[in-house]
């Protein structure tokens, strides 16, 4: 996608078996890129989902997550985006395969969505390299806290669920937790509401 490696790596579930690493340089910055398995969510139901979640939660949290989503399948891909927002990670979205969206005659106001979710969105075409330079320029801006789009938001799940999330967050703060402090307590609360057994076992 960026480092020029010719490994069999993709954005789709099951294509990447484990993490691949590459190095990319731009504008005086050196990026260590870790390509995690393709997944549509951060649940614990598949090996890919569990691997990605553990990497984000238990390993050293990345400075920036580049969330590569398929421009032709937005609804399915944006579910993962909402979960990353719940995790409160720094993120830039690569709206990949943007040419397929245009070929279908569709238009997408990605700049308005970016402002709504507080996260930069950059159209890309990985097979041609279109948008890659701009993508990493936005990564630099987010890292340097200079991107005007970035803001902290919560996905509102409705009054009933929000009350449950708030109650669980208060309970988490009252007990000793094995989870790193860098992990969003809101994210943990949502996972506990989902009866996520792996999270339950770690709190």
Place the predicted regions along the sequence by residue.
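Helical mechanochemical/support elements of P-loop NTPase systems and associated helical scaffolds
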Residues: 13-17, 29-32, 44, 48-51, ...
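Conserved G1/Walker A P-loop phosphate-binding module
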Residues: 1-47, 57-64, 86
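Solvent-exposed alpha-helical segments within well-ordered globular domains of core cellular machineries
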Residues: 22, 34, 47-54, 78-86, ...
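Active-site glycine-centered loops adjacent to acidic/histidine catalytic or metal-binding residues
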Residues: 35, 96, 125
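Extended helical scaffolds that flank P-loop GTPase cores
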Residues: 118, 145, 149-203
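Canonical P-loop GTPase G-domain recognition
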Residues: 99-156
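Switch/connector loops and helix/strand junctions flanking conserved nucleotide-binding motifs
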Residues: 41-43, 75-76, 100-104, 129-134, ...
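Conserved C-terminal guanine-recognition region of P-loop GTPase G domains, centered on the G4
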Residues: 22-28, 51-122
């Amino acid at each position: 996608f960026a480092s020029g490696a010719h490994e069999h790596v993709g954005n789709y579930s099951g294509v990447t078996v484990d993490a691949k690493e590459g190095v990319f340089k731009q504008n005086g910055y050196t990026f260590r890129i870790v390509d995690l398995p393709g997944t549509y969510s951060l649940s614990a139901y598949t090996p890919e989902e569990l691997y990605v979640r553990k990497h984000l939660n238990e390993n050293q949290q990345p400075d920036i997550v580049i969330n590569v989503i398929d421009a032709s399948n937005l609804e399915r891909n944006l579910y993962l985006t909402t979960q990353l927002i719940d995790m409160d990670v720094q993120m830039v979205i690569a709206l990949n395969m943007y040419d397929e969206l245009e070929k279908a005659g569709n238009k997408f106001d990605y700049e308005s969505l970016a402002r709504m979710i507080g996260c930069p969105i950059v159209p890309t075409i990985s097979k041609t390299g279109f948008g890659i330079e701009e993508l990493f320029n936005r990564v630099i801006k987010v890292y340097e806290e200079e991107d005007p789009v970035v803001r902290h938001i919560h996905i509102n799940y409705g009054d009933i669920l929000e009350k449950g999330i708030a109650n669980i967050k208060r309970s988490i703060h009252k007990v000793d937790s094995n989870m790193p402090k860098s992990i969003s307590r809101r994210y943990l609360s949502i996972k506990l509401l989902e009866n996520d057994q792996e999270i339950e076992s770690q709190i």
